[in-house]
């Protein structure tokens, strides 16, 4: 047995399913998950010492690459001052100012410890502010594992064939309306039924938990207009896209202004950090300024703030996002070219530092139902072929891929050469 196989069997005795987040268990592709011992730059190294070119990046945060020197050194220095205080710090203020500078739609921001906390709190704030109960989300979009958001969700829930989870009371779930992503008519139909009951729309501006689905032209703008018309708040969930699609996130890339934004992943530099923020009049409804309660023992943790600030500072370098987008385009279009060469149907999507590939005869993938019809046997074969070649992709057909600034010509060329060999064997 490999060391990963031994560790997985050991883990299953004490951890449900052997993992602490379901998609890591490889249920979507079969086989044994790789247990990782270390990471550096564009590479991760498993418990057996094998190196992989990594396109998961801890599910998005590692935009500069693993173990980046500036983040590592900042964290090591900060540790000497203590790990957690449970009291306000100057670092929180500096972080808030930095986030607001980079995301102009925010007047104020609240730090939390995860993306789930961010979306859960933003939903509560929207309900409290509007005094309405219903929320509208989109089929296949994932906003963390809060009860109201695990209805027809994406990510691991979709991978496991459980887009809705047991344990969510029907009386609670009935307040969650689920529309079709990239379909404004489906959204309008809910506002026709509940014109004064919908507190907010929440959306992944690039759906990264049903693979990678960018918005069609006019879709985000249409949602903004509907929220304005019916008095609902527009929440853009940038936990995945924030500081990855552009310096100001997907909202900056597409030119759409939300009422509230949720953040996670990149903002923490690899540490557990989330945030939500928006217009001052809405944020002032949050305790202790207002009546909507939200709190967290480790919110604004000084080590996490240090890591996040080091990463955000580095992301302000000129030309960084243009370079990252060019690398991402090269990988996605390289996969497509190799698939075409070997007669294997494939469609691709990419935006900023995110990409997706789909084994399908359809040319353009814009909806959840198209993703569910893709050839999963081809995906599993490609996944394990690439893993054997030393390329680590997301172990699910419903997750986006991520590049980092550490991926250079060598890594990209080796990845595309591996894809060519694997696809040749799949013919």
Swiss-Prot record:
The modification N6-(pyridoxal phosphate)lysine is found at residue 265. It comes from the Bacteria. Its cofactor is pyridoxal 5'-phosphate. One of its GO terms (molecular function) is pyridoxal phosphate binding. It is an enzyme of class 5 (isomerase). Pathway: Porphyrin-containing compound metabolism; protoporphyrin-IX biosynthesis; 5-aminolevulinate from L-glutamyl-tRNA(Glu): step 2/2. Keywords: Cytoplasm, Isomerase, Porphyrin biosynthesis, Pyridoxal phosphate. It catalyses: (S)-4-amino-5-oxopentanoate = 5-aminolevulinate. GO terms for biological process: protoporphyrinogen IX biosynthetic process. Coiled coil: none annotated. Its EC number is 5.4.3.8. GO terms for cellular component: cytoplasm. It is found in: Cytoplasm. The keyword Isomerase applies. Pfam families: Aminotran_3. Belongs to the class-III pyridoxal-phosphate-dependent aminotransferase family. HemL subfamily. Homodimer. This is Glutamate-1-semialdehyde 2,1-aminomutase.
């Amino acid at each position: 047995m490999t060391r990963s196989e031994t560790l997985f069997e050991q883990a299953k005795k004490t951890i449900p399913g052997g993992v602490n987040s379901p998609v890591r268990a490889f249920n979507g592709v079969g086989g044994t998950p790789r247990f990782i011992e270390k990471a550096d730059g564009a590479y991760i190294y498993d418990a057996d010492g094998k190196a992989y070119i990594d396109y998961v990046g801890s599910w998005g945060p590692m935009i500069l690459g693993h173990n980046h020197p500036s983040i590592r050194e900042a964290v090591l220095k900060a540790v000497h001052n203590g790990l957690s205080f449970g009291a306000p710090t100057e670092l929180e203020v500096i972080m808030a100012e930095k986030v607001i500078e980079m995301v102009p739609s925010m007047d104020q921001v609240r730090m939390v410890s995860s993306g789930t906390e961010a979306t859960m709190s933003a939903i509560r704030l929207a309900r409290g502010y509007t005094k309405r109960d219903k929320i509208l989300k989109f089929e296949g979009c994932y906003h963390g594992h809060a009860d109201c958001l695990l209805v027809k969700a994406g990510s691991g829930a979709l991978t496991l064939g459980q887009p809705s989870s047991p344990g969510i009371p029907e009386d609670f779930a009935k307040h969650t309306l689920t529309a079709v992503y990239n379909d404004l008519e489906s959204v309008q139909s809910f506002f026709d039924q509940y014109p004064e009951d919908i507190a907010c729309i929440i959306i992944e501006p690039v759906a990264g938990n049903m693979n990678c689905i960018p918005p069609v032209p006019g879709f985000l703008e249409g949602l903004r207009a509907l929220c304005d018309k019916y008095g609902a708040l527009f929440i853009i969930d940038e936990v995945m896209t924030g500081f990855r699609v552009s310096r100001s996130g997907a909202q900056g890339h597409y030119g759409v202004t939300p009422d509230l934004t949720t953040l996670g992943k990149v903002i923490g530099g690899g540490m557990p950090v989330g945030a939500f923020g928006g217009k001052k009049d809405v944020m002032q409804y949050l305790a202790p300024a207002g009546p909507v309660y939200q709190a967290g023992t480790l919110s604004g943790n000084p080590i996490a703030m240090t890591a996040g600030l080091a990463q955000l500072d580095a992301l302000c370098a000129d030309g960084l996002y243009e370079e990252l987008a060019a690398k991402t385009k090269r990988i996605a279009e390289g996969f497509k070219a190799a698939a075409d060469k070997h007669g294997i149907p494939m469609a691709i999507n990419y935006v900023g530092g995110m990409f997706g590939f789909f084994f399908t005869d359809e040319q353009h993938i814009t909806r959840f139902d198209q993703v569910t019809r893709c050839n999963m046997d081809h995906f599993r074969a490609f996944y394990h072929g690439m893993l054997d070649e030393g390329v680590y992709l997301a172990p699910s057909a419903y997750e986006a891929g991520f590049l980092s600034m550490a991926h250079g010509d060598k890594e990209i060329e080796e990845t595309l050469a591996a894809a060519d060999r694997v696809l040749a064997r799949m013919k």
